[in-house]
């Protein structure tokens, strides 16, 4: 028994499933999860002293790579001044100014502690602002583990085979209307069925929790138009795509302007940070200026704000996203070529610094039903083969991969070489 196996056995006696977030348990691929000792740049190092090229990046936040000196130094400096104050700080103002300058659709922003808090709060705000109860979400899109959003969800809910989570009361779920991602007709039909009851649409602009499924060209603009037609708010969940697909998020890349935006992951630079923001008129409905209540003891934590500010300052530098996209292109093209050489049917989806691998004979993967037809068993074998070659992919066929600026062309060539070996054995 190696050290990861020993730690996992101990953890299972103390923590449900041995992990503090389900997808980490390797249930989607089988086997024992790696216990990580440290990370640096594009590499993870486990407790058994094995090194891996990392394409999980802490599930998205590590766009600069692990242990980036600017973020590390900012965290240390902030910690020396105190860990938490429960009172406003100058860094909160600086962080809010930076975020709203980078994302033009956000006139105002409220900091929270996670992406789940951001989406949950945005939904409450939309309901309070519109006076309506129902929301529209999409099959396979995951917006955190709030009760109203765990309906036909993606991410770990798909991995567990529980798209509708037990513990969500039917009274909550009935207010969540589920449509088909990339299918505007299903959305119009739903609006026509409940024309005066829908408070908002919430959508991942790139569905990153049923692997990586970008929007069709007319999808996001069509959602914006339907919200305008029926008086609903348009909420874009950029927890995963924000500052990764483009500096101003996927909304700028695809040319749409939401009423509210949810952020997480990169905004914290590896610390637990989320945020939601949007039009001034809507945001001023939040307490203490308005009647919609939202609060958090650790929201705007000074260490988290320092980490986020340092991360976004680096991400905003010229050429960052061009480089990130070029590296992802190199990986996607190389994997496709390697699979083709071994007659392995593979679709690779990509959006900026995100990518997804689908073992399928289909020409494209554009919705939840396409994803569910892919060969999950083949992915499981591929995952473990790649792990043996020192490549760490997301341990689920339903999770996106993430590139970082710390990856080098040589790292990517090494990854493609490993994939060639694995494809030849699949």
From Swiss-Prot:
User: Biological process GO terms, please?
Assistant: protoporphyrinogen IX biosynthetic process
GO CC list:
cytoplasm
Q: Where in the cell is it found?
A: Cytoplasm
* UniProt enzyme class: isomerase
The UniProt GO MF terms for this protein read: glutamate-1-semialdehyde 2,1-aminomutase activity; pyridoxal phosphate binding; transaminase activity
Q: Which cofactor does it need?
A: pyridoxal 5'-phosphate
PROSITE patterns in UniProt: AA_TRANSFER_CLASS_3
The N6-(pyridoxal phosphate)lysine modification is found at 265
Record pathway: Porphyrin-containing compound metabolism; protoporphyrin-IX biosynthesis; 5-aminolevulinate from L-glutamyl-tRNA(Glu): step 2/2
State the reactions this protein catalyses. (S)-4-amino-5-oxopentanoate = 5-aminolevulinate
**What is this enzyme's EC?**
5.4.3.8
**Alphabetic keyword roster:** Cytoplasm, Isomerase, Porphyrin biosynthesis, Pyridoxal phosphate
InterPro entries in UniProt: 4pyrrol_synth_GluAld_NH2Trfase (IPR004639), Aminotrans_3 (IPR005814), Aminotrans_3_PPA_site (IPR049704), PyrdxlP-dep_Trfase (IPR015424), PyrdxlP-dep_Trfase_major (IPR015421), PyrdxlP-dep_Trfase_small (IPR015422)
Name the SUPFAM superfamilies for this protein. PLP-dependent transferases
Name of a matching Pfam family: Aminotran_3
Similarity section: Belongs to the class-III pyridoxal-phosphate-dependent aminotransferase family. HemL subfamily.
The entry describes its oligomerization and partners as:
Homodimer.
Official protein name in the record? Glutamate-1-semialdehyde 2,1-aminomutase
Traced from the root, the source organism's taxonomic lineage reads:
Bacteria, Pseudomonadati, Pseudomonadota, Gammaproteobacteria, Enterobacterales
Its gene is hemL
């Amino acid at each position: 028994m190696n050290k990861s196996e020993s730690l996992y056995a101990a953890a299972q006696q103390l923590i449900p499933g041995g992990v503090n977030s389900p997808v980490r348990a390797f249930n989607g691929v089988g086997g024992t999860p790696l216990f990580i000792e440290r990370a640096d740049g594009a590499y993870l190092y486990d407790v058994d002293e094995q090194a891996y090229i990392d394409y999980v990046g802490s599930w998205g936040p590590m766009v600069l790579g692990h242990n980036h000196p600017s973020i590390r130094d900012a965290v240390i400096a902030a910690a020396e001044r105190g860990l938490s104050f429960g009172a406003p700080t100058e860094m909160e103002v600086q962080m809010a100014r930076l975020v709203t300058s980078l994302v033009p659709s956000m006139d105002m922003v409220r900091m929270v502690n996670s992406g789940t808090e951001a989406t949950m709060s945005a939904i409450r705000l939309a309901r309070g602002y519109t006076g309506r109860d129902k929301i529209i979400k999409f099959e396979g899109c995951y917006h955190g583990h709030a009760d109203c959003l765990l309906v036909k969800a993606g991410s770990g809910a798909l991995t567990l085979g529980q798209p509708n989570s037990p513990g969500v009361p039917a009274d909550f779920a009935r207010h969540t209307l589920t449509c088909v991602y990339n299918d505007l007709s299903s959305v119009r039909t739903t609006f026509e069925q409940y024309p005066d009851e829908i408070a908002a649409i919430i959508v991942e602009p790139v569905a990153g929790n049923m692997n990586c499924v970008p929007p069709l060209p007319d999808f996001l603009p069509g959602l914006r138009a339907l919200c305008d037609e029926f008086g609903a708010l348009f909420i874009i969940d950029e927890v995963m795509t924000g500052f990764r697909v483009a500096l101003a998020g996927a909304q700028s890349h695809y040319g749409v302007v939401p009423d509210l935006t949810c952020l997480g992951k990169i905004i914290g630079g590896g610390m637990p940070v989320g945020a939601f923001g949007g039009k001034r008129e809507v945001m001023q409905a939040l307490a203490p200026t308005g009647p919609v209540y939202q609060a958090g003891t650790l929201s705007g934590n000074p260490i988290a704000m320092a980490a986020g500010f340092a991360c976004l300052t680096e991400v905003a530098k010229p050429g960052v996203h061009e480089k990130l996209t070029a590296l992802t292109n190199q990986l996607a093209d190389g994997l496709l070529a390697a699979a083709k050489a071994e007659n392995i049917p593979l679709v690779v989806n990509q959006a900026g610094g995100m990518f997804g691998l689908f073992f399928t004979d289909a020409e494209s993967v554009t919705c939840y039903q396409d994803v569910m037809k892919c060969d999950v068993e083949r992915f499981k074998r591929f995952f473990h083969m790649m792990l043996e070659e020192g490549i760490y992919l997301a341990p689920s066929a339903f999770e996106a991969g993430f590139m970082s600026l710390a990856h080098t062309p040589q790292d990517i060539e090494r990854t493609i070489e490993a994939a060639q070996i694995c494809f030849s054995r699949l």
